[in-house]
């Protein structure tokens, strides 16, 4: 009986005791916010000092009691802001609520703007992406491995706060914006690092879901306090924060528009004139580019935000997430990186989505990863390491899978040359030979670019070879789908082969340039000229600048490899029309050019579906396949909620539709492409604006799209 009573008492204590784990956010040189969650008692006390045995200052804070549909526990959210601290100083602290106290932890305030943290002039950051999954120990394993790696790199007796200033999480900190997920997915899975390193967050699409949605995000984080040069975004969706000589710009890919872009321009104007800022890093949840689930990116980030950021010579890179893998690429003409740090969320491997190999992506690896960014403040250098713990199919022990860098004030590579001698006309195939890569600072070759044109000024490119020394894309062999293949293994990228019959006969010009692994381009080589003869079959191309146009907006068609007849022409017709039987909507002759553009300045006045064709010698022989496009208003689709019960009714509102014959709305699973995958649900649209309801969807992630018949 005594044993039974003892066991029962012990179980009750375990059930009702409160283990306290602090969560740090919003670091500055003079302050730190400390948060934690309990299930009872509104006492909020932090006790801190300059040594673990001398905690002699007490700070009290506030407690908010949150409630949420379906959350049956108490949720006391404690917040204490410690102020009047010294810059770049290590403090020891513990937190207290009632009779419960945490262990003693430590944090470090940020250095003054422009200054390093360490004695050897460094400041470092951790970057991590999506966690989301509650039921599996994925993200907690990732943070534990990051904790271990910091110990391994900087010494077993060191604390994370000694060598890293903060962690940036790039969105989808939760799967849905509920109290349950903030408690058990975000806070609980971060306890390896959150007592030592402040965590700054970016809004992801999953923060907008669930019973509380963004209100839960706003309640847990204090982004409205963050300013740069006294500039606030005026909301908690996006912000700029300086740490040392780095300015982080956390964008919201979920709240795009002119207001955010205007704010971004204000931030850049200040940063460009701020001598304490040497580097700018931007972040958004939806990425700049992606080679899986192609198109699932932020077009606003790609087309608006990043082009604006690249106008600053302080801009280093853009970091995205959303895709649950690691990817790294470079902007084609500018010395800027773009990353996906996709954490450990729902499985994403080769063969489960639409995939495409893009020039501006050097590697896509389906690993669960984190990155350590090391900034050498004194010498103007940034080095980034990416560590992997593997994934579902293969585990890895903090394996280093990528490194890259950017160093200021370094020389560009030596100017290359085309070493071929063209003393007579040539027949294809032709291998263009570039000179050996050379750099005065021992940088290695990363990228080469060969351009071939029939125009001496390269105004129209007939053929381009743009290659990195490595190109990790697609499944490798017949093994597990996490294995990625290096498509450029064994390829000498200083050589480029023009295949037989791939370009037409005629005179061509060629030039090349080389890029090193510091993202510096060489000067272009001297141009060489050659003549192709005996090419029987050309490889003409024909593209439009867009697939959707508003009424009366310009339409540009670009063609290469044409026959070169004086009256070759580009024409536009309505969908379903035969060119020989009707008058075109408009046409333009090529005037004997084999390559060029046809600009329809005033576009088309009437909404509808059309196609453009490339025709030979004033007749109706089509040189290339037709290009279909749409003219009309931009349709707006809006779901009434972000989440729905399984089998329930999904309501889609639409407006500004063209209301053509048999327009329809389809429901597809994320990653599926209309026309190549079976849709889940669909229905016709009969008005320009209205509502459609879809019922019976199984569990999963979906999107709605407006399609034309």
Describe each PLM feature range:
Residues 120-135, 245-255, 281-285, 336-343:
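Active-site-proximal beta-strand elements of phosphoester/diester hydrolases
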Residues 143-211:
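Core catalytic region of metal-dependent phosphoesterases/phosphodiesterases
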Residues 92-96, 509-515, 611-615, 703-708:
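Extracellular recognition modules
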Residues 17-137, 160-161, 277, 386-389, ...:
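Acidic, histidine-bearing metal-coordination/catalytic regions of metal-dependent phosphoesterases
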Residues 23-31, 331-412:
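Binuclear metal-dependent phosphoesterase catalytic core
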Residues 139, 255, 274-317:
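Active-site-proximal segments of metal-dependent phosphoesterases and phosphodiesterases across multiple
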Residues 503, 521, 525, 534-709:
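Extended, solvent-exposed regions of the mature portions of secreted/cell-surface glycoproteins
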Residues 90-112, 181-274, 304-317, 325-364, ...:
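Extended active-site neighborhood of metal-dependent phosphoesterases/phosphodiesterases
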């Amino acid at each position: 009986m005594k044993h039974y009573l003892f066991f029962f008492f012990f179980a009750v204590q375990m059930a009702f005791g409160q283990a306290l784990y602090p969560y740090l956010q919003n670091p500055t040189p003079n302050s730190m916010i400390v948060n934690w969650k309990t299930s009872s008692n509104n006492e909020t006390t932090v006790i801190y000092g300059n040594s673990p045995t001398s905690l002699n200052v007490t700070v009290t804070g506030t407690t908010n009691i949150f409630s949420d549909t379906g959350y049956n526990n108490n949720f006391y959210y404690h917040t204490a802001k410690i102020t009047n601290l010294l810059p770049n100083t290590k403090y020891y602290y513990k937190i207290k609520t009632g009779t419960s106290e945490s262990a003693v932890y430590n944090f470090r305030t940020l250095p003054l703007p422009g200054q390093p943290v360490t004695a050897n002039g460094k400041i470092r950051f951790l970057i991590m992406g999506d966690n989301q999954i509650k039921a599996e120990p994925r993200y907690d394993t990732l943070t534990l491995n990051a904790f271990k790696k910091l110990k391994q790199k900087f010494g077993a007796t060191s604390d994370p706060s000694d060598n890293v200033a903060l962690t940036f999480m790039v969105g989808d900190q939760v799967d849905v914006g509920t109290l349950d997920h903030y408690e058990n997915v975000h806070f609980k899975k971060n306890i390896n690092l959150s007592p030592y390193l402040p965590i700054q967050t970016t809004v992801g699409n999953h923060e907008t879901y669930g019973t509380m949605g963004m209100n839960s995000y706003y309640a847990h984080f204090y982004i409205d306090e963050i300013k740069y040069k006294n500039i606030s975004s005026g909301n908690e969706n996006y912000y700029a924060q300086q740490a040392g000589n780095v300015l982080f710009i956390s964008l919201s890919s979920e709240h795009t528009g002119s207001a955010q872009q205007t704010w971004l321009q204000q931030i850049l104007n200040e940063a460009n004139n701020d001598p304490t800022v040497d580097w700018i890093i931007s972040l958004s949840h939806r990425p700049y580019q992606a080679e899986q689930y192609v198109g699932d990116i932020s077009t606003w980030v790609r087309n608006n935000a990043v082009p604006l950021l690249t106008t600053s010579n302080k801009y280093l890179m853009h970091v995205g997430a959303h895709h649950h893998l690691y990817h790294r690429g470079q902007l084609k003409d500018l010395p800027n990186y773009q990353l996906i740090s996709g954490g450990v969320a729902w499985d994403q491997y080769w063969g489960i989505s639409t995939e495409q190999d893009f020039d501006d992506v050097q590697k896509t690896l389906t690993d669960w990863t984190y990155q350590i960014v090391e900034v050498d403040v004194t010498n103007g250098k940034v080095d980034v390491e990416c560590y992997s713990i593997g994934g579902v199919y293969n585990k890895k022990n903090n394996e280093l899978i990528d490194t890259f860098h950017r160093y200021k004030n370094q020389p560009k590579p030596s100017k290359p040359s085309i070493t071929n001698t063209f003393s007579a006309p040539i027949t294809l195939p032709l291998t263009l030979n570039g000179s050996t890569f050379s750099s005065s600072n021992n940088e290695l070759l990363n990228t080469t670019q060969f351009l071939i044109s029939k125009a001496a000024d390269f105004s129209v490119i007939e053929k381009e070879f743009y290659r990195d020394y490595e190109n990790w894309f697609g499944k490798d062999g017949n093994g597990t789908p996490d294995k990625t293949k290096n498509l450029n293994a064994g390829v000498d990228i200083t050589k480029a082969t023009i295949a037989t019959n791939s370009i037409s006969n005629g005179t061509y010009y060629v030039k090349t340039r080389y890029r090193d692994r510091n993202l510096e381009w060489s000067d272009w080589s001297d141009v060489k000229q050659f003549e192709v003869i005996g090419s029987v079959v050309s490889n003409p191309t024909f593209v439009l600048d867009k697939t959707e146009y508003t009424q009366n907006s310009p339409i540009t068609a670009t063609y290469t490899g044409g026959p070169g007849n004086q009256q070759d022409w580009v024409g536009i017709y309505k969908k379903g029309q035969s060119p020989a039987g009707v008058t075109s909507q408009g046409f333009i002759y090529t005037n004997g050019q084999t390559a060029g553009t046809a600009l329809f300045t005033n576009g088309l006045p009437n909404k509808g579906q059309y196609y453009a064709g490339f025709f030979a010698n004033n007749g109706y022989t089509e040189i290339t396949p037709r290009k279909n496009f749409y003219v009309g208003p931009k349709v707006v689709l809006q779901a009434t909620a972000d989440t729905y019960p399984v089998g329930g009714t999904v309501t889609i509102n639409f407006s500004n539709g063209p209301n053509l014959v048999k327009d329809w709305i389809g429901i597809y699973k994320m990653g599926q492409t209309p026309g190549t995958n079976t849709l889940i649900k669909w229905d016709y649209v009969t008005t320009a604006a209205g509502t459609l309801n879809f019922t019976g969807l199984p569990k999963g992630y979906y999107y709605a799209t407006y399609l034309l018949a």
